[in-house]
UniProtKB/Swiss-Prot annotation:
NCBIfam families: rplT_bact. It comes from Verminephrobacter eiseniae (strain EF01-2). GO terms for cellular component: ribonucleoprotein complex; ribosome. The keyword RNA-binding applies. This is Large ribosomal subunit protein bL20.
Length: 119
């Protein structure tokens, strides 16, 4: 069997890892052995936080809706219950956006909810 020299593949692999580690501080960005570990850890964090991001944004939307609803005399849970009873199917992301950027539209939704809760 012929001898296999791995200079080309090794260099390519090193270049790929170091490119992924670009911007890392210190030896994490320019020493292959350390950069490889840093890139693996960064990938783990990225995987974990793509899932965490969904939870964090949902919490943010609920906090914004709650604050806006309380200004108009309802708690978040009362507001959510009223939305369900009034058959208003707007998701939390859109409600939070309305609460921040279009107070009048959010206020009209709250009035519909209050009317439905009073019945």
């Amino acid at each position: 069997m012929p001898r296999v020299k791995r200079g080309v593949t090794a260099r390519a692999r090193h270049k790929k890892v170091l490119a992924l580690a670009k911007g890392f501080r210190g030896r994490r960005g320019n020493v292959f052995r350390i950069a490889k570990q840093a890139v693996m850890k960064a990938g783990q964090y990225a995987y974990r936080d793509r899932r965490t991001k969904k939870r964090v944004f949902r919490q943010l939307w609920i906090a914004r809706i709650n604050a806006a609803a309380r200004e108009l005399g309802l708690t978040y849970s009362q507001f959510a219950n009223g939305l369900k009873k009034a058959a208003i199917e707007i998701d939390r992301k859109m409600l939070a956006d309305l609460a921040v950027h279009d107070k009048a539209a959010f206020g009209s939704i709250v009035e519909q909810v209050k009317a439905r809760l009073a019945v």
